[in-house]
C-alpha cells in the first residue's frame, strides 16, 4: 500500500465521519520534531526539547548549511561532533536522558484514574505487578479468571471486530495516542457496517492474549493496540496487531498483521485508524490475516 492509497483511505474514513481530513503528516512532523538548529552547548537546555534534538555539535564546519539540512531531515543522532575520541558533553547527556525516558515508560503504570476517565472496562492478565510482567511474558498471554468472567458478562458477544487496548511495554504510547486513534477507529468500523465489540483495557497484556480474547468473545477479527518497546527518545510508539479468527492452540505469529510505529513522528494515529479500518474490512472479505492474506 503506497502513500497515495493511505491518504485516500484517510479521506474516505474521515468523510464518512463528517470530519475534515487531517493535514499531510509531513507538515505535522515538521512542526513537532524539527526546530532551528542550535550550535552552542547550554547547561540550561531541556534535553528532551526540540531544541536539544536539533543541536549541532560539529565545531567550525566547512559547510554549515549542509549540516543544518541534514539535521532537519532526520531524528537520528547525526552532527553531534566529537571531543577527541569521545562524544561531546551535551550529546552524551542527551543520550543518557533519552535512555532514562525509555526506561521510565517501561516501568510506569497506566493510572487507574486515566482508564476510568476514558470509560473503559479494565481487566488484567495473570500478571499482578510490573516486575512479574517483565520477567514472565508467558503469564501476560493469558487472562486471569476474574477477567474472563468480566468479559463474558460485560462485552458484546460474537462481534465482527473486537478492539483491545493494552499497556504493553510503553505506558506513554497508550495515554498519548489514545484520543487520536480510538474514536476515529471505532467510528470508522461502525460506518463500515461492522458489528463492533465493547472496547476494553488489558493491564499487563502481551500480544498473544488477543487469541484468548477472540476465542472467548467469538470475534471474527481482534485488533490489539499495544505500547511498543521504546527506543532511545521515542517512548510514544504504538503498534496494532490484527488477527482473523484467533485460536489459542493454533494461531502463530505469522497469522497476525502488524502496523507499527504509530505516533506523531511516524504514522499519525488518525491515519493509522483509517488504515486499520480498511485492514479489518479486507480481513473479513478474505477470511484471513497475516501471511495468508492476498496482497
UniProtKB/Swiss-Prot annotation:
PANTHER family: ETHANOLAMINE AMMONIA-LYASE LIGHT CHAIN, ETHANOLAMINE AMMONIA-LYASE SMALL SUBUNIT
Top-level taxonomic group: Bacteria
Lineage: Bacteria, Pseudomonadati, Pseudomonadota, Gammaproteobacteria, Enterobacterales
Cellular localization per UniProt: Bacterial microcompartment
GO cellular component: ethanolamine ammonia-lyase complex; ethanolamine degradation polyhedral organelle
Entry's Gene Ontology molecular function annotations: cobalamin binding; ethanolamine ammonia-lyase activity
Predominant localisation class: other
Identification of the protein by name: Ethanolamine ammonia-lyase small subunit
Pathway annotation: Amine and polyamine degradation; ethanolamine degradation
Organism: Escherichia fergusonii (strain ATCC 35469 / DSM 13698 / CCUG 18766 / IAM 14443 / JCM 21226 / LMG 7866 / NBRC 102419 / NCTC 12128 / CDC 0568-73)
Cofactor: record remark: Binds between the large and small subunits.
Amino acid at each position: 500500500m503506497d502513500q497515495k492509497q493511505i491518504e485516500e483511505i484517510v479521506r474516505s474514513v474521515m468523510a464518512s465521519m463528517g470530519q475534515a481530513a487531517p493535514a499531510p503528516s509531513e507538515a505535522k512532523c515538521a512542526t513537532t520534531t524539527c526546530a532551528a538548529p542550535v550550535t552552542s552547548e547550554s547547561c540550561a537546555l531541556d534535553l528532551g526539547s526540540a531544541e536539544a534534538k536539533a543541536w549541532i555539535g560539529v565545531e567550525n564546519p566547512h559547510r554549515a548549511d549542509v549540516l543544518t539540512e541534514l539535521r532537519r531531515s532526520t531524528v537520528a543522532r547525526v552532527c553531534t561532533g566529537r571531543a577527541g575520541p569521545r562524544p561531546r558533553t551535551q550529546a552524551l547527556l542527551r543520550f543518557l536522558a533519552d535512555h532514562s525516558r525509555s526506561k521510565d515508560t517501561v516501568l510506569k503504570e497506566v493510572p487507574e484514574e486515566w482508564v476510568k476517565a476514558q470509560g473503559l472496562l479494565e481487566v488484567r492478565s495473570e500478571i499482578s505487578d510490573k516486575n512479574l510482567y517483565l520477567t514472565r511474558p508467558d503469564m501476560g498471554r493469558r487472562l486471569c479468571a476474574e477477567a474472563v468472567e468480566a468479559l463474558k458478562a460485560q462485552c458484546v458477544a460474537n462481534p465482527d471486530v473486537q478492539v483491545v487496548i493494552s499497556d504493553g511495554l510503553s505506558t506513554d504510547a497508550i495515554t498519548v495516542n489514545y484520543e487520536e486513534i480510538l474514536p476515529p477507529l471505532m467510528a470508522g468500523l461502525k460506518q463500515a457496517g461492522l458489528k463492533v465489540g465493547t472496547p476494553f483495557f488489558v493491564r499487563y497484556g502481551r500480544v498473544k492474549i488477543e487469541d484468548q480474547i477472540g476465542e472467548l468473545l467469538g470475534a471474527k477479527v481482534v485488533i490489539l493496540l499495544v505500547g511498543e518497546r521504546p527506543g532511545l527518545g521515542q517512548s510514544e510508539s504504538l503498534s496494532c496487531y490484527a488477527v482473523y479468527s484467533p485460536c489459542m492452540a493454533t494461531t502463530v505469529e505469522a497469522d497476525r498483521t502488524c502496523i507499527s510505529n504509530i505516533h506523531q513522528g511516524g504514522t499519525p494515529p488518525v491515519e493509522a485508524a483509517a488504515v486499520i479500518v480498511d485492514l479489518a474490512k479486507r480481513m473479513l472479505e478474505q477470511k484471513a490475516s497475516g501471511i495468508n492474506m492476498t496482497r
